[in-house]
Amino acid sequence: MTRRPRLLTTAAAGATAALLLTACGGGTNDTKSNDKIDGAETASATTATSTTPPRPSAHRPRIELPSDLSYAFDWSKTGDADKDAVLSDSEQSIKAVDLAIVNQNALDKAYLYYYEGEAAVGTQKFIQTYVDNKASVTGAYRFYDPQVSVDKGGTASLSYCEDQGKAYVKYLKTNEVKRTEVTAKSYVSYHTSLKKNSKGVWVIQKIVSQSGSAQCQP
């Protein structure tokens, strides 16, 4: 399952495939390799209310995104070290997927650092759709209403909402941005299952998303 619902879809027109780039609803125009994952397994504007930055001891990848992408994580520290670590690594995993899209690399090392198994396979396919269509992402993303729980066995779950109302698809060849109207589908819920690996990193093993989720509506 992908990190967020596909912003990119393909429709057939006769024998020719016509690309329809959308971001959760209808909109107007403005002038994601088939390789298998091993084990299959700043310009960026940062958050106004972000959790602590990732711990450097695990040598987490440096994620630098272009200035046309911004993120707001409306989830504050919980006061619990494990829960805060889950939130922090989840922030980076979200940005890492967009970095792979920006880099046009479905096997980008940064996101593979945070995803494994089923989640990695689904995310690779999601990124490859953008790569195949020479498309990227632009705009502003907001994440809110986190619900995190940590088990003693080194596993955790995180549910949260995403506001995609100001996030768009961008064609790389023409630099055209597909601007879309904000609809109920612009609000997406996510449910992730994570595991703490040997490096102390909370990696995502499963992820389920629902666009238009009632619990995420403003």
What does each of the following model-derived ranges do?
Residues 1-4:
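N-terminal secretory signal peptides that target proteins for export/translocation
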Residues 7-8, 12-15, 24-52:
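Short, low-complexity, disordered segments immediately C-terminal to signal peptides
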Residues 30-31, 43, 72, 143, ...:
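Intrinsically disordered, low-complexity, compositionally biased regions/tails
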Residues 40-70:
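Acidic, low-complexity proline/glycine-rich segments
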Residues 61-136:
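Core segments of small alpha/beta cavity-forming domains
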Residues 106-109, 113-218:
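Structured, amphipathic secondary-structure segments that form assembly/contact surfaces
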